[in-house]
Swiss-Prot record:
It comes from Schizosaccharomyces pombe (strain 972 / ATCC 24843). It comes from the Eukaryota. The lineage of its organism: Eukaryota, Fungi, Dikarya, Ascomycota, Taphrinomycotina. Keywords: Nucleus, Repeat, Ribosome biogenesis, WD repeat. The keyword Nucleus applies. Belongs to the NLE1/RSA4 family. The gene is rsa4. One of its GO terms (biological process) is ribosomal large subunit assembly. This is Ribosome assembly protein 4.
């Protein structure tokens, strides 16, 4: 009797229609290609190239044409076809010809974009171990303007401000009466906010570490998340609006300068886990209640509720997050002459980022999955991303918005396409839960922190570990890569702040 095969599942049917591996023919006709800069600043003459050329081969050819061969620049390539931009993922054949998008006799105009106009060197060694905290370090963040200033929050009820150049503490910021759960620099680096399990938010001078004004006390349970208003949206008086998320199920919007509560955003039915303030003046909040809410920052009204997760949502990341965090500061060593000058530069950077990749949102959950959203266009997911075997603790868009890195309790880091959500790679090397990951400013490198006491630096292009960084004596909860690319900071249960450099 013949064996009857079970019917294909929906997933198997989908995979059969979209095979993950496509055989690329060794011989394929030459095609007519013209390279054009994505900003229309340069257009090269047409030439013939093999229709099965890989992205790396196109990159090498373009560098040769642009006379960059001595110091080659990595590029992304895209094809504009019928009012749609198709990114060249691996090679021309799979992206353009295999699916019949175009024919070999067609003329192809390939838009090229440098992945970054400067390069960040991988951190390779611990250059400082700074002691002072008497409790577990659970949060760490570099100043948006310089890698010489770092703030950390700890279970010893204090935050500390560090000088990373001299490897010494500047100040111990005392005032909280419970764990400091989150820290946040204003995007112009003019003020530091700290949130605590004592239900309060405090503010500090970033030069001396001295307190600024009284604590904000309207939350009734611990503060879990802080996020400043983006610099390009700030009024002439300065960047003084802050969003806070709490275990009391609310998000609150504050005028920090006046010490007034502007709005209480009520609607979540369980504790808030993460808050993001987008560049379109929308506020995004995630919660134990399995939902993400979108709020209008102008009036505090709930605009949308994003549903799709089956368990609590742990973390959110925006594709524009890097430029929102760093404001006007970039690789050009920009020195603003005034606040309006600073705000103008921040707006230019944001609009350039928005033009390149839009403003998408990714959410990470206890249900082992991620969801990619385009909230400005729809409340329905772009896609759901499966693969992690345990809780997904953290998600982070690369600065260029093209890639998403996720950290999970399954001991792995995964990479996903930032536009489609397509799975790209699993980065294995950690032997225990991975807590956080942080990108280099040029989007080429990634660092992850783990329960296994190590940091690991990954090369995103090769999808392999570049450096293993042991040194901590206990699990590492917090990691940050400075916006200028010079340093990585980490902290954890061994109470030490470690600085890593190249």
């Amino acid at each position: 009797m013949a064996t009857l095969l079970p019917p294909k599942s929906k997933r198997q049917k989908k995979e059969s229609l979209n095979p993950t591996t496509i055989e690329i023919p060794e011989k394929f006709p030459l095609v007519n290609v013209q390279f054009r800069a994505s900003d229309d600043s340069n257009e090269l003459a047409s030439l013939l190239v093999p229709g099965n050329s890989s992205v790396r081969q196109l990159e090498a050819l373009l560098n040769q044409l642009l006379e960059n061969s001595d110091d080659p620049v990595p590029y992304n390539f895209a094809l504009h076809h019928e009012d749609e931009t198709i990114e060249i993922q691996d090679n021309l054949y799979t992206s353009v010809f295999h699916n019949g998008l175009m024919k070999t006799e067609d003329h192809l105009t390939l838009l090229y974009t440098p992945q970054a106009v400067f390069r960040v060197r991988a951190v390779t060694r611990c250059t400082a171990s700074m002691n002072g905290h008497d409790g577990t370090i659970i949060s760490a963040q570099f100043s948006p303007s310089t890698s010489s200033r770092l703030v950390t929050g700890s279970g010893d009820f204090t935050a500390r401000l560090w000088d990373c150049d001299t490897q010494t503490p500047i100040a111990t910021m005392k005032g909280h009466t419970n764990w400091v759960s989150c820290v946040a620099w204003a995007p112009d680096a003019s003020i530091i906010a700290t949130g605590s399990m004592d239900n309060t938010i405090r503010f500090w001078d970033p030069k001396k570490g001295s307190p600024i004004g009284d604590a904000l006390r309207r939350h009734t349970k611990p503060i879990m998340a802080l996020c400043w208003q983006p610099l390009h949206l700030a009024p002439d008086s300065g960047p003084y609006l802050l969003a806070s998320g709490s275990k009391d199920n609310t998000v609150r919007i504050w005028n920090v300068k006046l010490r007034t509560l502007l709005f209480t955003l009520s609607g979540h039915t369980a504790p808030i886990t993460c808050v993001r303030w987008g560049g379109q003046n929308w506020i995004y909040s995630s919660s134990y209640d399995k939902t993400i809410r979108i709020w209008d920052a102008k009036d505090g009204k709930c605009l949308h509720i994003l549903k799709g997760h089956a368990a609590r949502v742990n973390h959110l990341s925006l594709s524009t997050e890097h430029v929102l965090r760093s404001g006007a500061y970039d690789h050009t060593d920009f020195k603003p002459k005034s606040f309006s000058d600073e705000r103008r530069k921040a707006k230019e950077r944001y609009e350039a980022c928005l033009k390149q990749s839009g403003e998408r949102l990714v959410s990470a959950s206890d249900d082992l999955q991620l969801i990619l959203w385009d909230p400005q266009k729809s409340t329905k997911p772009i896609t759901k991303m499966h693969g992690h075997q345990k809780v997904v603790n953290h998600a982070s868009f690369s600065p260029d918005g093209r890639c998403i890195a996720t950290a999970s309790f399954d001991s792995s880091v995964r990479l996903w396409d930032g536009k489609t959500g397509k799975f790209l790679a699993t980065l294995r090397g950690h032997v225990a839960a991975v807590y956080q990951c942080a990108w280099s400013t040029d989007s080429r490198l990634l660092v992850s922190s783990s329960q296994d006491t190590t940091l690991k630096v990954w090369d995103v292009r090769s999808k392999k570990m570049k450096f293993d960084l042991p040194g901590h004596e206990d699990q590492v909860f917090a990691v940050d890569w400075s916006p200028d690319g010079q340093r990585v900071a980490s902290g954890g249960a061994d109470k030490a702040v470690r600085i890593w450099s190249h």
